[in-house]
A protein has these predicted regions:
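Conserved beta-strand-loop-alpha-helix hinge in the C-terminal portion
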Residues: 208-235
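Conserved ABC ATPase "signature" region
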Residues: 109-124, 146
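The feature captures the beta-strand-to-loop junction immediately N-terminal to the Walker
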Residues: 37-39
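Conserved ABC transporter NBD signature motif
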Residues: 60-68, 77
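Helix-to-loop junction immediately C-terminal to a conserved catalytic motif
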Residues: 52
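ABC ATPase nucleotide-binding domains
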Residues: 225-264
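Conserved ABC ATPase signature
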Residues: 128-132
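Q-loop/switch helix immediately C-terminal to the Walker
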Residues: 87, 92-107
């Protein structure tokens, strides 16, 4: 696969104190759903903020689409990358339908209608944004991000706003967008169960990447994950322990299949 984001030796700190990142390296595959997780204060949201604009003062390089982000104009970069930070988002219009159209340089009715249908926005189009649930506000922000980028969508704290089943539905929707609009999704999560149906999982801690790969292969490294202070999903944790006793060959997520395997 093609690498679309390449982060090399990234160093960043707030007010030149307490480095958040120390020589962080990371690469993101194009047309993937990539999850980033880590303990509290590991820099998950900060990393997305650094990717969301090319104006931060930092050391190291961030290459997107084979070009250093500092070499993009603001207009170019805004079209390349769109980010959703739900806690810091400001809506400019009172109604949902008006907010959807406000920043589109050229109105794309097909894309807009696709997003309205697939993000279940039809029932709220004429509602006042202030009356929306947290989930509907986030869905509106996702739709705006997709409308205004041709490449990368960054989504912060996804599982603070949606339950596990809702996130699975969103992943299905993201895959439609990847196929239809050639997009790449980079998300931050707290609960590792929500990484299983992504393509790649990064775990960051103490300024760097400590694990990276396909989610189930990463989650197999239970000792490293536990030392980082993260909780491994129950079925995965159980599978890993059973593998250690040679009772299981692979991680099994389905309880019935696991029982059947053990009773054979």
């Amino acid at each position: 696969m093609e690498v679309i984001v390449n982060i090399n030796n990234l160093e960043y700190s707030y007010n030149d104190k307490n480095n958040i990142f120390n020589n962080l390296c990371m690469y993101i595959q194009k047309n993937s759903i990539t999850a980033i997780s880590g303990p509290n204060n590991s820099g998950k949201s900060t990393l997305l903020k650094l990717l969301s604009t090319n104006k931060y003062n930092k050391k190291g390089s961030i290459i997107i689409d084979a070009k250093d982000i500092v070499d993009y104009s603001k207009k170019e970069y805004d079209k390349l990358v769109q980010a959703v930070f739900p806690n810091n988002s400001i809506f400019k219009q009172p109604k949902v339908i008006d907010e959807l159209y406000i920043n589109q340089e050229e109105i794309d009715e097909e894309k807009t209608n696709f997003l309205i249908e697939n993000l279940n926005l039809t029932k709220i189009l004429n509602k006042d944004i202030n009356t929306l649930s947290r989930q509907d506000k986030y869905r509106l922000l996702i739709s705006k991000a997709i409308l205004n980028t041709n490449s990368i969508v960054l989504l912060d704290s996804l599982d603070e706003y949606f339950n596990n089943n809702e996130i699975k539905e969103l992943y299905t929707f993201f895959r439609k967008c990847i196929e239809k609009y050639d997009l790449t999704f980079i998300i931050t999560i707290n609960n590792l169960i929500n990484s299983i149906e992504t393509d790649y999982l990064f775990i960051i801690n103490q300024g760097g990447t400590i694990l990276y790969g396909e989610p189930l292969k990463v989650l197999d490294k239970d000792n490293i994950i536990n030392k980082a202070g993260l909780e491994i999903p129950f079925m995965i944790d159980l599978s890993v322990k059973l593998k250690d006793y040679n009772l299981l060959n692979n991680i099994e997520l389905n309880k019935e299949r696991l029982i059947n395997t053990l009773w054979k």
